[in-house]
């Protein structure tokens, strides 16, 4: 083996000692690839006397485009015919143009482009950065970020301190349930509760100086009480630090434990919110299997029975494939448990792992369902493509209702037990409601 190795090294050194002249090799390659003789050398004086080739005007291409067919010629299907032969697109055909084919070759699929009424600006304002800094400093979470809410630029980027708001998410950023529409992280064993969260939440809300605040929470089926005592303690801490603040809590169903529902409802909050999310027929396909439509109705009913003067609220997503008949049945079911406020919003797919959007509902349809809800006796209805259950679109109205009730109680009135019709009539007379 040693002798063969020495022989191999000797052979390698012999090859390396043979050098190939680089210039000669380059010249040989040049001759090998040249098929025509060298161009003649021209005198510089002759080239200077030659007439330069005229350059085409830069605008020549633009002139040709302007003289050609316009964009309307393409979308209207018109070619070279007369203009009176071109038929404008109807709404269905125009809407069909908002589709696109995406994906690799052979596996392309058609998607619907996001309608213009669902596009929002990128958040970047001083108030947005201030709220984000406060949340990070106090180790707090918001549903605005975790659920990828499209209204974050509006809610966090208010022009003034009182105009900006955020929805605090209690009990961490990890949920024990996996609804197909929600982008919040899920785990069977989420981190333990932060014992300082109630105090930190109260500190943040008192620092912002807001008049109306929404708190929500993840579902914690790993806890015996579902986190109800933690939520109730947070409400009490907030009311101690900011007694004048109006507080709305968007809660889970606490696995159907109505005692825990009553505990939260009587903790001092002003609005009890729990979302049914969709119609009953679609609930098994949209929500986690542990959440049912009838259980949500029982939660809303129990909260109202625990405090009859408490405003109860729920939210419904459109665009999941629900029918008009199913929506009517849902509203009737909500009225049977005396729900005061309902909101309608467009479902928007957060990631490819979540269920697809069945339909982008037009703004006019949202306006129609708002009228129908008010006719059925709901105290208020916020309805629109970008409306969310904790969006501030309906908070101004509810805030005025609560302030009216507080004022009546202080003046020796009915102590906050005014009826739904009286509240609405007073606010209409005052110009608050249109």
Curated annotation (Swiss-Prot):
Domain Radical SAM core, first and last residues per copy: 158-379
Residue ranges of coiled coil: none
Catalytic activity: [[Fe-S] cluster scaffold protein carrying a second [4Fe-4S](2+) cluster] + N(6)-octanoyl-L-lysyl-[protein] + 2 oxidized [2Fe-2S]-[ferredoxin] + 2 S-adenosyl-L-methionine + 4 H(+) = [[Fe-S] cluster scaffold protein] + N(6)-[(R)-dihydrolipoyl]-L-lysyl-[protein] + 4 Fe(3+) + 2 hydrogen sulfide + 2 5'-deoxyadenosine + 2 L-methionine + 2 reduced [2Fe-2S]-[ferredoxin]
Cofactor: [4Fe-4S] cluster
Domain of life according to the entry: Eukaryota
GO molecular function per UniProt: 4 iron, 4 sulfur cluster binding; lipoate synthase activity; metal ion binding
EC number: 2.8.1.8
Keywords: 4Fe-4S, Iron, Iron-sulfur, Metal-binding, Mitochondrion, S-adenosyl-L-methionine, Transferase, Transit peptide
Region listing for Disordered, in residue ranges: 34-55
Note accompanying the cofactor annotation: Binds 2 [4Fe-4S] clusters per subunit. One cluster is coordinated with 3 cysteines and an exchangeable S-adenosyl-L-methionine.
Residues binding [4Fe-4S] cluster 2: 175, 179, 182
Matching InterPro entries: Aldolase_TIM (IPR013785), Elp3/MiaA/NifB-like_rSAM (IPR006638), LIAS_N (IPR031691), Lipoyl_synth (IPR003698), rSAM (IPR007197)
Transmembrane region(s): none
Pfam families (alphabetical): LIAS_N, Radical_SAM
Keyword Mitochondrion: yes
Entries under NCBIfam families matching the protein: lipA (TIGR00510), PRK05481.1 (NF004019), PRK12928.1 (NF009544)
Listed name of the protein: Lipoyl synthase, mitochondrial
Source organism of the structure: Paracoccidioides brasiliensis (strain Pb03)
């Amino acid at each position: 083996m040693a002798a063969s190795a020495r022989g191999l090294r000797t052979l390698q050194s012999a090859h390396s000692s043979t050098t190939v002249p680089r210039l000669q090799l380059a010249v040989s390659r040049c001759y090998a690839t040249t098929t025509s003789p060298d161009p003649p050398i021209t005198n510089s004086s002759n080239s200077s006397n030659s007439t330069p080739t005229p350059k085409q005007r830069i605008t020549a291409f633009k002139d040709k485009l302007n003289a050609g067919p316009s964009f309307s010629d393409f979308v209207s299907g018109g070619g070279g015919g007369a203009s009176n032969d071109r038929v404008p697109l109807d709404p269905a055909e125009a809407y069909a143009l908002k589709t696109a084919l995406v994906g690799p070759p052979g596996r392309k699929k058609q998607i619907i482009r996001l309608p213009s009424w669902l596009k929002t600006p990128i958040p970047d304002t001083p108030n947005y950065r201030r709220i984000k800094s406060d949340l990070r400093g106090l180790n707090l979470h918001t549903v605005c970020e975790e659920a990828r809410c499209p209204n974050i630029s509006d809610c966090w980027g208010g022009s003034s301190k009182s105009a900006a708001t955020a929805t605090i998410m209690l009990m961490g950023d990890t949920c024990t349930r996996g609804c197909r529409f929600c982008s919040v992280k899920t785990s069977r064993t989420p981190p333990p509760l932060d014992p300082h969260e109630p105090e930190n939440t109260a500190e943040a809300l008192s620092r912002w100086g807001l008049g109306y605040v929404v708190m929500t929470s993840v579902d914690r089926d790993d806890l015996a009480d579902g986190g109800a005592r933690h939520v109730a303690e947070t409400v009490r801490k907030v009311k101690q630090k900011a007694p004048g603040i109006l507080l709305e809590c968007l809660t889970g169903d606490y696995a159907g434990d109505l005692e825990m529902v009553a505990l939260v409802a009587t903790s001092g909050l002003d609005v009890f919110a729990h979302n049914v999310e969709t119609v009953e027929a679609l609930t098994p396909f949209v929500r986690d299997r542990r959440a049912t439509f009838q259980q949500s109705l029982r939660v809303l009913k129990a909260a109202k029975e625990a405090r009859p003067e408490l405003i109860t609220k729920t939210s419904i997503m459109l665009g999941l494939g629900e029918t008009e008949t199913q929506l009517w049945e849902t509203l009737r079911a909500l009225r049977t448990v005396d729900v005061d406020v309902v909101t309608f919003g467009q479902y928007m797919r957060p990631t490819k792992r979540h269920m697809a959007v069945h339909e982008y509902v037009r703004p006019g349809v949202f306006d129609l369902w708002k009228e129908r809800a008010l006719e059925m006796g709901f105290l208020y209805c916020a309805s629109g493509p970008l409306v969310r259950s904790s969006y501030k679109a309906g908070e101004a109205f509810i805030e005025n209702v609560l302030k009216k009730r507080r004022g009546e109680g202080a003046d020796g009135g009915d102590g906050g037990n005014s009826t739904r019709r009286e509240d609405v009539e007073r606010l209409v007379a005052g110009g608050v409601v249109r």
